[in-house]
């Protein structure tokens, strides 16, 4: 028998691609492997929080307007005129031997010198606060860099700014872990895992202490005015303590600027997270039914203080947050509730005795 004829093949038309199946191949897992599965981490951050963070960054950038330049130029011209007039008065008083006027000129020079010195000091501290944001950006770049140029010097500068002595155990472990073949990303990563947690742990303890004090003070104090003054004073002290831990010396204007940055950051980016975390805890545990109104207000004040401390910690920290390193309100919430319940139980048991 003759073989059947084959169909015609037309090479003028393009080749047709065979459709591929969208299904993945079957995978079989053993019973032992099934116990090692972990649920996928779901990012609970709302979608609009990224937009809020961008709005914060745009709001915190200094705006160099024409009016500001004109005001600064006018102040510089006025200062030069005052100095020139003072020099002229001093020369005239010396030539005429007017010792009273000469003493007044000397006193004025001392006052002006003290004012200029304080302005320069405030400017330097404010500049250091602004430089911390640039250092954080530089650290973020180094954590993605494969060069071997600036990593070690950058980390040593951070340790010196934070007041960490060369004989500190954490710094000694970091020196022992690094070697010449490591790149900047590995060196800065080792610093972030070995040295930076020492400062972060101290900052967390300060936040816990100040938040607990705010909670207990609001819970037991009957005067709202005293509560407001106490909370404002303790929050400023908390910001100063955190800035000092991270090697930033705050002046008057730099303290106001940091406080403003923290409040702006909370207002833009922290409202949704605060409402979500506090609301979930209060609704799930029904704290309003268990605790008194003053106790609930104390917990709210303590959580706001903790939120303030977390944001101050984020702005003063020289390194960006790594995975799961950023403190959350939940870390402090359970501690505050436990301390408040313990205090209330002690106060109830003391009259019975």
UniProtKB/Swiss-Prot annotation:
Species whose genome carries this gene: Salmonella typhi
Family the entry assigns: Belongs to the UPF0283 family.
Pfam families for this protein: DUF697 (PF05128)
Annotated segments matching region Disordered: 1-48
Periplasmic side: 1-69, 121-212
TM annotation in the entry: 70-90, 100-120, 213-233
Protein name: UPF0283 membrane protein YcjF
Keywords: Cell inner membrane, Cell membrane, Membrane, Transmembrane, Transmembrane helix
Record carries keyword ATP-binding: no
GO CC aspect terms: plasma membrane
Matches recorded under NCBIfam families: hyp_HI0043
Lipid bilayer topology: Multi-pass membrane protein
